[in-house]
Every structure is written in C-alpha cells, then in structure tokens.
Amino acid sequence: MSFFTQLCSMDKKYWISLAVLSVTVLISALLKKRATETEDIVVVHYDGEKLNFVLRQPRLNMVSYTSFLRRVCNAFSVMPDKASLKLNGVTLKDGSLSDQNVQNGSELELELPKLSPAMQQIEAYIDELQQDLVPKIEAFCQSSPASAQDVQDLHTRLSETLLARMIKLDAVNVEDDPEARLKRKEAIRLSQQYLSKLDSTKNQNK
C-alpha cells in the first residue's frame, strides 16, 4: 500500500482532530503576537530594585513624562516632588516619553536628590522617634498602670528621653538650608504632640 493510500485510509476523526489542533496553535500564536504588539514595557531601576511597567492604554507614544513619573514613584513608594527619571544618563523632561527616545524595552533610572547633612540628621531623628519612642509612648497611653507612681515614673522616663532628643534636634544647623529648617519644625511639632499625649495620660491616671 502506497503512502498516499495509507493517508487516505486514515480515520476521518484523526484528520478533524489534526485540523482543530493546527487551528488552535495558529490562533494562540496570533493572539500572543497581537498582545505583544498592543503593549509596551518600560523597565525602571531604583535602589537595587527593578520593576516592569506595562503600558497598554494609553500606549507609550501617548504617555507624558509627568504622569509616568507619578506612576513610578507610587510603585516605589517615594515622593515625586524632586524625583527624576534618566535614560542612558540623560535626565528626561516634561513631554512625551517617545519624543525622548523612550521605547518598548527601554531601561530607566529613578533618582532622588541626595539629602543635605542637616536633612540626614533630621530624617534620622524622625526614624528613631517613630521606631523607638513612639511604640513605647503608645503602649504607655494604652496600658492600665499598677499605680499612680508607676505612671509618674514611666512618664518621667519617656518625657526626659524625648526632651533630650529634641535638644539634639534643635542643635542641628539649618541656617543655610530652608528645606531642613522647615523639616525640623515639622519634627519638633510632631515631638510636642507626643509630649502632650504623655502629659494627658499622666493627668488622667492621677
């Protein structure tokens, strides 16, 4: 029996199954190609991390620098005020991304300005306050003390610790740094709120 005769003698169901499989594979390939053609991906690096940003609607040629920067900063949980994006070392400007040679597959760098020495000290103060003292203050305000003396002792210890740190904060030189001066005011205001909270709890437990 010839090869052609063997083919003709094959079950009709086999040919139908083969045809269905071929069509399925073809459709899958077309859909995958279409999906690729209808989306752009831009990679952004920041602080050792890398995120892929998929752009479908609107497409890359319709996306502005400002809106994309806002999306990137939100994903990395940073403030967009002074952040910037760079492509091959060149800082991007407001306007269309595609007009600045950002293409599908481009890799960008998210950069934030370096903090001044004064800002670094103030940020360190706030971090230490939030991570170290605030949990202790909150625990003091929510606990049921054994005696009025316990309240007094713990209040004194926490208040003196906070005041000592505020004195160091006040010594930070912000004379030529308006931004640091404003940030220090915010830190002092926050600290005073916790001092008031300590005093209020002490007075309630007299």
Swiss-Prot record:
Top-rank lineage group of the source organism: Eukaryota
Subunit and interaction comment: Binds to the ATPase domain of HSP70/HSC chaperones.
Biological processes, Gene Ontology terms: nuclear protein quality control by the ubiquitin-proteasome system; protein folding; protein stabilization
Protein name per the record: BAG family molecular chaperone regulator 1B
Function: Inhibits the chaperone activity of HSP70/HSC70 by promoting substrate release.
Annotated keywords: Chaperone, Phosphoprotein
Record GO terms (molecular function): adenyl-nucleotide exchange factor activity; protein-folding chaperone binding
Pfam families documented for this protein: BAG (PF02179)
The keyword Metal-binding is assigned to this record: no
Residues found modified as Phosphoserine: S144
Residue ranges annotated for the BAG domain, each copy included: 122-202
Biological source species: Schizosaccharomyces pombe (strain 972 / ATCC 24843)
A single cellular component GO annotation: membrane
Source organism phylogeny: Eukaryota, Fungi, Dikarya, Ascomycota, Taphrinomycotina
